[in-house]
Amino acid sequence: MEDSAIASTLASDTYGLDIVDTNIQDMKNNTTRFLIMSKELQQERNENLSYLTSCIFEVKSVPSALYKALGGFATNGVNLTKLESFIVDGDFNKAQFYIDLDGHAEDQSVKGALEELSFYTEKLKVLGVYPKHSYRNN
């Protein structure tokens, strides 16, 4: 085998690929997320859908910075579904955080939460907005 990929059976059917193995996940409900990148916001708000928004931010290096940064989500009623930390450039005094939150970046509550977040961050970037899959509603 010269080249290989982890892909869906749909990719196999579409591109005529051979399936070497199936169900290779290490956890029963494992999921893989794929991204479509764009310089402009592409996901217009549809009132009939629920959304997730993904962001990345770097807190200021001061006591309680993360606590204060996250407070805006609580006061605006925005649920965080994921929070991951990363060390920036090997500097243990700087942390960058990835978050997923319930809601669309254009929702008033999300706008308010992100505005409050920006007061306590060095950098803040909305990575994307996408429809929430129905399995997340359980």
Predicted regions and their residues:
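Domain-level signature for soluble enzymes in the chorismate/prephenate branch of the shikimate pathway
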Residues: 1-138
